[in-house]
């Protein structure tokens, strides 16, 4: 059996945009050839693609990172750099991608979802030609692609989730009402991964998941614990199956333990529509235990079945279908806020430090953005770099630090001597 992996962390690195270049036409018989430096190509994106044929994140297990190709640099003669090749990764339906605890993508369909945006290609000097500057020696580097540590979580998607204590009959019930061939045995924790099945009821159908058995303390991680409680969150209806046929079992205690675990894990989960199923009606003492339960919980409606003998299963399917139909009329659950991947945005801030006399260092997201965007390879680019720093207030702030001509200023790995002119 394939290993069930439903949570991993890895780094996503989209492609960097290609750099624009400085170039001028140099052709025989062409007098005063103008600028012809082309733009860099866009960096490749990373997409996750929903695949109903997958039910685990095993294919991503062991990967430290997923990357896309960088864009190609521009060329002379106004040649645009090629776009970097995007990367497409197939993942199970129900996969969620988080960045700094914010939801980036919720894969609920068989389609492509953008999870990391490629960088923008830098402009070549042909784009900077104007009436005032007919021979610009200005170009831009491509911007970095989006890079972050992704927290990837799989929550199995099904209409109905079957929950209960170990050996309550969950797998037997799934096999009896659906097309699933679940593993069944007379020992606890037979089900180690969620099992999915399709249930047909008259002209309708719905999906059911058999989830690993819950024990006291599951919400704190005991047994298979929190790892599988999260899968129930995706279900629209919860079927709680209880063993009413065994003398050593306590149906009331089992009912209360499961409800407490759901409540402690998530109030939203505990409030989902629920069908309580009394299993093993074929065994002696069943009816007596049902009556004791009803005396304690007269308002809890239960469906009496025997999963192994396939007794009263049509009534159960009808009850589930009715609740599913009623659930459609309820307000939709609030979705987690999704972070838009339109463009990498940086804050407009910077910091000036003066660790010792005659030395100043400028750091911050906005400074890095400008520095990486403008390659300091020509006088015109230096002028543009200087102008942008002046525009955001860096030079005025340096004067407040009483900077003097001859002092050293460092911006990342670029150092220059302050001459008092800007």
UniProtKB/Swiss-Prot annotation:
Residues 158-325 form the OBG-type G domain. One of its GO terms (cellular component) is cytoplasm. One of its GO terms (biological process) is ribosome biogenesis. The keyword Repressor does not apply. Keywords: Cytoplasm, GTP-binding, Hydrolase, Magnesium, Metal-binding, Nucleotide-binding. Residues 334-420 form the OCT domain. The keyword Secreted does not apply. It is an enzyme of class 3 (hydrolase). GO terms for molecular function: GTP binding; GTPase activity; magnesium ion binding. Pfam families: DUF1967 (PF09269), GTP1_OBG (PF01018), MMR_HSR1 (PF01926). It is found in: Cytoplasm. Residues 2-157 form the Obg domain. GTP binds at residues 164-171, 189-193, 210-213, 279-282, 306-308. Its cofactor is Mg(2+). Gene3D superfamilies: GTP-binding protein OBG, C-terminal domain, GTP1/OBG domain, P-loop containing nucleotide triphosphate hydrolases. Its EC number is 3.6.5.-. PROSITE patterns: G_OBG, GTP1_OBG, OBG, OCT. Mg(2+) binds at residues 171, 191. Its main location: cytoplasm. Monomer. Belongs to the TRAFAC class OBG-HflX-like GTPase superfamily. OBG GTPase family. An essential GTPase which binds GTP, GDP and possibly (p)ppGpp with moderate affinity, with high nucleotide exchange rates and a fairly low GTP hydrolysis rate. Plays a role in control of the cell cycle, stress response, ribosome biogenesis and in those bacteria that undergo differentiation, in morphogenesis control. This is GTPase Obg. It comes from Mycoplasmopsis agalactiae (strain NCTC 10123 / CIP 59.7 / PG2). The gene is obg.
């Amino acid at each position: 059996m394939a290993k069930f992996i439903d949570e991993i962390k890895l780094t996503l690195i989209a492609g960097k945009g290609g750099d624009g270049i400085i170039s001028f036409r140099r052709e025989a018989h062409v007098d005063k050839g103008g600028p012809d430096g082309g733009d860099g190509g866009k960096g490749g994106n990373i997409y996750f693609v929903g695949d109903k044929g997958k039910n685990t994140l095993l294919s991503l297990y062991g990967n430290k990172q997923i990357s896309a190709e960088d864009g190609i640099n521009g060329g002379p003669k106004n040649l645009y750099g090629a776009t970097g090749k995007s990367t497409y990764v197939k993942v199970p339906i129900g996969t969620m991608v988080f960045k700094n605890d914010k939801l980036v993508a919720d894969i609920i369909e068989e389609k492509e979802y953008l999870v990391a945006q490629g960088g923008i290609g830098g402009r070549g000097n042909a784009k900077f030609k104007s009436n005032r500057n007919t021979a610009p020696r200005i170009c831009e580097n491509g911007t970095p692609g989006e890079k972050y540590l992704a927290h990837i979580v799989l929550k199995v998607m099904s209409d109905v989730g079957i929950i209960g204590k170990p050996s309550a009959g969950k797998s037997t019930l799934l096999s009896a009402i659906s097309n699933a061939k679940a593993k069944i045995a007379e020992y606890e924790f037979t089900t180690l991964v969620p099992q999915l099945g399709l249930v047909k009821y008259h002209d309708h159908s719905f999906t059911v998941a058999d989830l690993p058995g819950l024990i006291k303390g599951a919400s704190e991680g005991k047994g298979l614990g929190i790892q599988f409680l999260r899968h129930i969150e995706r279900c629209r209806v919860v079927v709680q199956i209880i063993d009413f046929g065994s003398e050593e079992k306590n149906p009331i205690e089992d009912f209360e333990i499961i409800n407490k675990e759901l409540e402690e894990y998530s109030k939203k989960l505990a409030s989902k529509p629920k069908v309580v199923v009394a299993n093993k009606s074929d065994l002696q003492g069943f009816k007596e235990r049902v009556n004791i339960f009803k005396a304690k919980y007269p308002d809890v409606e239960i469906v009496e079945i025997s999963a192994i003998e396939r007794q009263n299963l049509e009534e159960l399917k009808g009850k589930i279908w009715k609740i599913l139909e009623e659930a459609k009329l309820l307000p939709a659950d609030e979705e987690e806020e999704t972070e838009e991947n339109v463009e990498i945005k940086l804050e407009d801030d910077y910091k000036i430090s003066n660790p010792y006399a005659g030395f100043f260092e400028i750091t911050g997201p906005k400074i890095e953005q400008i520095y990486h965007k403008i390659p300091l390879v020509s006088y015109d680019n230096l002028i543009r770099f200087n102008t942008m720093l002046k525009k955001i207030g860096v030079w005025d702030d340096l004067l407040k630090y009483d900077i003097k001509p001859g002092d050293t200023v460092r911006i990342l790995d670029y150092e220059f001597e302050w001459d008092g002119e800007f």
